UniProtKB/Swiss-Prot annotation:
Protein name: Prokineticin receptor 2
Segments crossing the lipid bilayer: 52-72, 87-107, 134-154, 169-189, 221-241, 271-291, 311-331
Gene name of the encoded protein: Prokr2
Coiled-coil residue spans: none
PANTHER family the record matches: G-PROTEIN COUPLED RECEPTOR, PROKINETICIN RECEPTOR 2
Length: 381
């Protein structure tokens, strides 16, 4: 079957009438070295990359699926956990949880089982790509909102904090911006049959921009790169730099009680954790954006490299693994969510005559608390 006779932004153009396959590479996310004698998906390099990708996807499904479910369940059950920072973290948890249980199984089948061949139809192809893109932007925007919230709470403690209505508006804004910006990833996603080697076809699933839309694609990518990576990283870096100056290099006037010192240690621990998360975010996503820039704006640098497709998927895998770091840091380190979850399970299976006392002691009411309540370090008694 002859592929479409058009140049694309995410797949190469094949011209079937010719005796041999002619490639006109452009700005591709999933360009396959077509028409070569050797199937790149059968090489040892791709086999090793497939193992790495499979392990990473399995880790994402396990860590993000279970970890974020535990956090969401604990947050819904215990009002003590519901402060503004945790409400923002909940956005990360929800988006990563959806990716872990919805996207990753299909990606495991696409990358590892079928080795870059899609078998689930156009609707699921577009939906999986769209949901994964929305999750990335939600995570980025939520991390940015958390950094700004910490900045206002620590550097400007006397200014009024956000109330519940403002926090709800901010959370809605995080999702609306992410959903709207990611629309092109769904609109331009399609299935395309590509001939990798002679008489061997694979069904490509990804974004395809026609040759006359390359300028729009470049503009869109640069817009997203600035709005969802450079801008947030610079803003978060400035926020945490100013917070660090406030917590470590500013003398606290007056006598410091044990409670004040404990609060300061708590805030320092939280900020160190958040700076570590920012560092992990940059280390995971910078290679992905860097590779994409080189591939889309300087295509001759990579298209001649035999294993550049394998390299791209490994880079993409590293980027996706950032969700595991977020889950481990936010869910298990910061809030001791597992302790709350274990308490919840013990309470659920405890005999009924102990139920009322346990509920009162553990503060299990599901009514909300003010979004301005600050709990930097939560510990069970």
């Amino acid at each position: 079957m002859g592929p479409q006779n058009r140049n694309t932004s995410f797949a190469p153009d094949l011209n079937p009438p010719q005796d041999h396959v002619s490639l006109n590479y452009s700005y591709g996310d999933y360009d396959l070295p077509l028409g070569e004698d050797e199937d790149v998906t059968k090489t040892q390099t791709f086999f090793a990359a497939k193992i790495v990708i499979g392990v990473a996807l399995a880790g994402i499904m396990l860590v993000c699926g279970i970890g974020n479910f535990v956090f969401i369940a604990a947050l819904a059950r215990y009002k003590k956990l519901r402060n503004l920072t945790n409400l923002l973290i909940a956005n990360l948890a929800i988006s990563d949880f959806l990716v872990a249980i919805v996207c990753c199984p299909f990606e495991m089948d696409y990358y590892v089982v079928r080795q870059l061949s899609w078998a689930h139809g156009h609707v699921l192809c577009a939906s999986v790509n769209y949901l994964r893109t929305v999750s990335l932007y939600v995570s980025t925007n939520a991390l940015l909102a958390i950094a700004i919230d910490r900045y206002l709470a620590i550097v400007h403690p006397l200014k009024p904090r956000m109330n519940y209505q403002t926090a709800s508006f901010l959370i809605a804004l995080v999702w609306m911006v992410s959903i709207l910006i990611a629309v092109p990833s769904a609109y331009f996603t399609t299935e395309t049959i590509l001939v990798i080697v002679k008489n061997q076809e694979k069904i490509f699933c990804g974004q395809i921009w026609s040759v006359d839309q390359q300028l729009y694609y470049k503009s869109y990518f640069l817009f997203v790169f600035g709005l969802e990576f450079v801008g947030p990283v610079v803003t978060m870096t400035l926020c945490y730099a100013r917070i660090s100056q406030e917590l470590w290099f500013k003398a606290v006037p007056g006598f410091q009680t044990e409670q004040i010192r404990k609060r300061l240690r708590c805030r320092r621990k939280t900020v160190l954790l958040l700076m570590g998360i920012l560092t992990a975010y940059v280390l995971c996503w910078a290679p992905f954006y860097g590779f994409t820039i080189v591939r889309d704006f300087f295509p001759t640098v990579v298209v001649k490299e035999k294993h550049y497709l394998t390299a791209f998927y490994v880079v993409e895998c590293i980027a996706m693994s950032n969700s595991m770091i977020n889950t481990i840091c936010f869910v298990t380190v910061k809030n001791n969510t597992m302790k709350y979850f274990k308490k919840m399970l013990r309470l659920h299976w405890r005999p009924s005559h102990y139920g009322s006392k346990s509920s009162a002691d553990l503060d299990l009411k599901t009514s909300g608390v003010p979004a301005t309540e600050e709990v930097d370090c939560i510990r069970l008694k």
